[in-house]
Amino acid sequence: MKGNRRQPAVASQPTSPASPTPSKGTSKYANRDGSKIISVPKPSLSVETPQPSPTVSASMPPPTAGKGQPPSTAPTAPSGSNASGGEAAPTVNRKKAKRRAKLAAKAAAEAGLSGDNLSNGVAAHSASSSLPKQPSDAGHSDNEGEALSRPSQTNGHTSTGASKSKKGRKSKNEDGRFMDSAGSATGSNHHAEMRRPPSPIPHASPGRASGISKEKIWNTSSQEERQRIKEFWLGLGEEERKSLVKVEKDAVLKKMKEQQKQTCSCTVCGRKRTAIEEELEGLYDAYYEELESFANQPNPNGDVPPMLGPTGHFGSTAYTSQIMPSKYPPRQPSRGRIVEHCGDDEDDDGEDEYSEEELDDDEDYSDDEEPEEMHRQRPTEYQTDFFNFGNSLTVQGTRFHESLNSLPPYAKSYMEQVLKYVFRRDVDHSLGGILTVADDLLKNDGKKFIEMMEQLAERRMQREEDAKEQFARNYHINGNNYPAHAHPPPPEDDEEYEDEEEEEEYDSQDEEYDEEEVQTNPVHCACHCPCRGGDYGDAGMSASADDGSYQDHGQESHAKQHRHLQDSMTEEQRMEEGRRMFQIFAARMFEQRVLTAYREKVAKERQEKLLEELAQEDRETEKRKAKKQKEAQKRRDKALQKKQAQAEEKARKDAEKAAEEAERLAEEQRRQEEQRQKNEERKKKKEAQRKAEEEERQRKEAERLRRAQEQKERQAEQDRKAREAKEKEKKAKEEAKQREKAARELKEREARERKEKADKERLEKEAKIKAEKEAREAQRKAERASQKATTLANVPVPTGPARRQSQAPNPAPALPQSQQASVASPQLPTAVPALPKLPTPQKPRRTSQQEPFTSGFAAQQVHGQGAGQYPAPPKAATPVHTSPGPGGLLSKGSSSQGQSLHSQATSPLGTSLPTSTSLPTPFGMPHPPPNQHYPPGIGPLNAPPGLGGPRLFNDYPEQMYQQSPFGFRQATQQHPQLPPGLGIPMGPGRGLGHGPPPPPGLSAQQSDFPNMPASIFGSIPKEPSPLSSHSRQASANFDSPIAATPIARPTPIGRPGSVVQGRRGSSDSPGRPGQPGQDNLEEISAPHLGSSALLDDLDEPLMDDFMQDTRSARRSIPGPPQSSRFPPPAVGSFPMSNSPFGPSLWSQPGPSLVNQGFGGSFGQPAPPPGFNSLSDALSVNSPWTFASRPPPRHNLPQMRKVLIQACLDLASTKTPLLDEKAEDPSRRYLPITAVKKCVDTKFASGSTFTVDDLMSMTNTEGNANNGGGSFDTQEFDGELCVRWVPDDIGDSRTVGRSVGEIGSPIVGSRG
């Protein structure tokens, strides 16, 4: 029976390399370093292929065949028979065996000395796949640094004793690590005794699909990954496994057809395509049948299916004999068949190591799990996988070299060519990480596989041709069933020769591998499968003709090689090799399918795991949230409870506090009641005390009121008495005023009567005197003609007597003619002067003989002379050249003055009035002291310009001019320094007494300064010149209205003297000098007629304001009140535009004070000779300066005229106009600010006009006096504008006329 067939145990036999008995059926080969020993089985004559005993197979792990190792076909002796019994063993070349045994012994000795592990030298089918890794063996399989080769057994032949000893020693060095080997029962028993039994793994239930622990789903360890892949395959169902297996056929066929589309359509290619498709169909069908048969084969032990045979490969004879009868008869292995030791334990360890290191690349997985996955078996140590060959090549470092060196020369050359073709580089440079051949074939779109199929089809076609050829040569060939071992073994000499040739070839291949690179042909490489270990014929086909792989047969032709192949391997064997090659590729592709499915499964599980973890996280988050909410609710409940407890505690405390508060309130009420009672008692006491105090206060108040009433009564009485006294006094004053008024009226009436009487008498007397004068003049005319001219040219006659009594009568030289001519008025032409004649003494006349209208001034002079003054000696009278007064304004004074002068004509020439004779001061000023000196031209009696005599001021009342309108500061008593040019100190309390010199033609005043040289006004003699007894009016231009004015009445219509000159003291009326007489009172009280009607309404208030301003200026002087002695200027004597008092009241033209040396107060003209500058003299610290200056006042009509003129000027210039639409530029609106600036420039002295003043003037109705026309105002862009519109009827030419009031005489006008 099959189960009783056991191989003879030969383990106890002594082993010797030279022993002929054990080595009869094998040939041993060793590489140079001795690490690998190759046992080549010799051809066996046995027809039946022995199968291993099921018992042995079940109890002992079968040895794995080396990758690419063909299934063992060596027959074993039947049960109970010895190896030597039965059929004769094939002959062995003893010489080769002996030589190889020596080499093996030598190599073993060297390996023992160097510590290297050697193989036992037993010929066996080596397996390249690693054992299934168990948890107990994981540490050994994964941690071993270098895998060692394991002994193999082939065809039931046991190894020699030396080999066994080496194996035992090697196993000790490896800590009990062993490799499966197929051999005899002895070898198997030996391995069973030495190997530790593997711990079984429980069979995975089909319900556990994933078989993967969720806790280790992310683990990428190689060992756990293998385990998970196994569990995944075992967990798959029947249909899932079939789908994974059968999908390969369609994919390969489809890829093959796509590849064949690019070939030509010739008959050969068509046959090739057909052969390829048939080959694939047949191979896949057989492959699926084998898989199905293997899966469905009953398990002898009841738990797992039968294990693989010694070869461990699909399609092997051992395997197929177990599951199905082979359709090919058993064949004798080729005499060139060898057993590779490259797939031993050493390669397995390297593969495990590589699988652990390269698992992340997902390129290779351990080959130990695929058989278990495919067959759903529990992984055991004796199971192998389908991919040992590919993974056996995946080694690193020198171990790969060792693996290659362990191959025979033709196999090693083929592997090098394949690797070079795959990686396009040398083998030595690809040791860092080499993929398997199957992986490369799969990753290169199956090109390698397709080429292999093409080679198989070509070989099939070649086999058919060979069969025909052999049939033609009378060879017995069965096309379908090849006879087993039909080829007889070659002669022993040929075998020996071939062995020697193989040895030489092997040596030469080793040298070539070590020394030079081997060139390969990719097409031939794909044709020869490395899994079959290669034979001589295949090795010859796999190498190119010129690659130097064979030293002796490199130049043989292809036909010779083919014949050699036919001799060395039967067709059955070649078909078996192709079939086995296909199975390897199909297994590799199936492995990739399983791996892809596993990866998809893992990815899905990982995704589910991620989703589950996310869901778990969500659940945990929800749990945490719920927990937090629960905790928060607990906290809220706890806080609520706490609040409730606090509320209860608070309520309790509030209750206690309320109780305490009630007690306190009760106590407080009790205390308040007691306090109230005490307060009431105290209040009653206070009330009684208050009543007593109130009574006392009322009593005192009544007493106080009584006293106050009495005081009021007394005060009222006193007030009544005071009022009565005041009333009495007022009545007395009123009565006195009435009486005084009545007396004044009486006096005025009497004075008027006397004045009328005197006037009448004066007229009569004047007529008489005129007649007498004309008579006398006719008599003396011839006598005084020559004298009058010289006298009149050299000696000016003074118009009045001397004003100083203390000065000596020293005559002063007369002014030269040139000086008199320089000051003469150009508008007063003089007639041809009469020649002066010798004066004739005349008898002085009495005062009673004088005219009744002689002024008191002259009378005082006469009376003064008669009072004890010595009269001057009589001299010849010189006619006085007198010019008429201006405009008849002073006709009355000038006539009386002329009469006064004529009254003194009886006195001789050269005599003067006595020094004691004093003239009344103007405006009622007191007489100056005798020793008072004045600057030249500023004497107390000098009249203002235009008024020609001292009698000018005698007609004004004294009380009107008690204070000077000019606020000059008085000089000190110590006579301070006079201004430059004056040189004479001035007495204290004196102002500027002398005025400017009179106009040309009027007599000049004498100087009061005895030592004063001739002044700027001409020669001023100390004593007055003797008055001429005869005077006549000088000839004048009758065209001039002023020259035609008579000396006396009738005078032209003009302003009354009372209005023009103010109050004047009457010299005609009796009384004291300077006091107003009756005539003056009547004149003042009488209404003004005539030219007074021509006065403007604003003139009189201006006069009052003028006097008021002068008083205020005087009051503004610091210090005690002092009276100024400076006489006021003549009315209209200077224009008010240069005056601090505003415009002139009557606009009388005449020289202003600035022309008389008043300095910077009235302008700055050049000072006359002898005066440095009155502006220096009238400085702030000078006694001649004004203490204050009143603000200037302007005449409103004149101001309106100036405003009109300003509007016309602006309209005529390029001033920007706001009303551009007006046709007439003079009627355009002008900004009020520009008009104001123009008005300010016209008043050089500085105006105080404001915009409101100008606007008020624009509202004044125009007339002939103020310029006429009317003003229009309008606002443009927020700015007020004004324009002047002239009247249609009125004449606007009056605007441009010179200043002056209506009725004022103007020099040069025709009146």
From Swiss-Prot:
GO terms for cellular component: cytoplasm. Residues 1-226, 308-379, 478-521, 542-576, 613-1083 are annotated as: Disordered. Residues 93-103 have a biased composition (Basic residues). Residues 46-58, 116-133, 960-975, 1026-1038 have a biased composition (Polar residues). Its main location: cytoplasm. It comes from the Eukaryota. InterPro entries: Fungal_stress_NST1, NST1. Residues 450-521, 599-795 form a coiled coil. Residues 923-933 have a biased composition (Pro residues). Residues 8-27, 68-86, 805-829, 891-922, 934-945, 1041-1052 have a biased composition (Low complexity). Residues 213-226, 613-682, 689-786 have a biased composition (Basic and acidic residues). Residues 984-994 have a biased composition (Gly residues). CDD domains: ATP-synt_Fo_b. Residues 343-372, 491-518 have a biased composition (Acidic residues). It is found in: Cytoplasm. May act as a negative regulator of salt tolerance. Belongs to the NST1 family. This is Stress response protein NST1.
